[in-house]
């Protein structure tokens, strides 16, 4: 169809969720990261929850390996498992050392309901879907962190130098991280070039749900250390 040729899959997904994605930048937690005003208790609790999120996120890639129809896609998913465990989690490990978070504390910290709902949904999509559906769920998270970090730097150029939160900001705008997102995007475009309108609508549904879960995750993070939230 003519409209299909005019807009790639990723552009379509981003257009469908532009209001949700715009809301990320206004989240109090993200604003706190940007200006360095975030309560460290909230950030500490966020690091613990995000650690557990990443463990399940990695499992989504592992299901992708099992669902792969080509060696190329299999290698892509496998590469990301390593990239997440060696890359993103290393950012967390640094903060864990700073905050004195032990494996024992991690093991005894309950996973918050919003976090569990998000990863359960992603795992469900992965088990039910194929390569493109899995990539769609993954890309929502992976790319949103880059977009958020870039916007932070655009609005507060000194943010990457902040003694506490600068490392977080820098981690999501590194050439490795942003380069990996380009690879994900290109593969998603290739896998969906012959998708029907019905298939594309389903991807839109997945991407929208994951984007809403991302927004909820930032809201959850802002509740940490407050009454009714997780005490750091």
Regions found by a protein language model. Name each.
Residues 7-14:
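Extreme N-terminal tail/first-helix region
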Residues 12, 72-179, 208, 212:
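Active-site-proximal alpha-helical scaffolds that flank and shape metal-associated catalytic sites
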Residues 18-23, 38-67, 87, 136-146, ...:
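Alpha-helical bundle segments that constitute or directly flank the non-heme di-iron/ferroxidase center
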Residues 45, 49-56, 79, 83, ...:
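A non-catalytic, amphipathic alpha-helix used as a structural packing/dimerization or gating element
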Residues 174-208:
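Long amphipathic all-alpha helical oligomerization modules
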Residues 204-232:
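Acidic, carboxylate-rich catalytic segments that either coordinate divalent cations
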């Amino acid at each position: 169809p003519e409209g299909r040729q005019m807009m790639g899959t990723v552009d379509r997904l981003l257009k469908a969720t532009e209001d949700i994605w715009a809301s990320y930048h206004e989240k109090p937690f993200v604003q706190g990261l940007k200006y360095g005003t975030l309560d460290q208790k909230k950030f500490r609790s966020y690091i613990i929850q995000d650690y557990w999120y990443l463990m399940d996120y990695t499992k989504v890639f592992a299901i992708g390996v099992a669902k792969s129809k080509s060696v190329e896609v299999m290698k892509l998913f496998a590469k990301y498992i390593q990239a997440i465990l060696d890359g993103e989690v290393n950012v967390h490990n640094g903060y864990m050392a700073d905050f004195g978070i032990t494996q024992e504390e991690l093991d005894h910290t309950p996973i918050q309901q919003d976090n569990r709902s998000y990863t359960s949904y992603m795992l469900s999509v992965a088990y039910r879907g194929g390569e493109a559906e899995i990539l769609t769920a993954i890309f929502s998270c992976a790319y949103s962190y880059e977009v958020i970090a870039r916007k932070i730097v655009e609005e507060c150029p000194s943010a990457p130098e902040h003694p506490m939160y600068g490392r977080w900001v820098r981690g999501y705008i590194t050439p490795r991280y942003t380069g990996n997102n380009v690879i994900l995007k290109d593969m998603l475009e290739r896998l969906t070039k012959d998708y029907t309108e019905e298939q594309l609508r389903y991807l839109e549904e997945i991407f929208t749900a994951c984007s809403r879960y991302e927004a909820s995750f930032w809201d959850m993070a802002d509740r940490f250390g407050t009454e009714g939230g997780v005490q750091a």
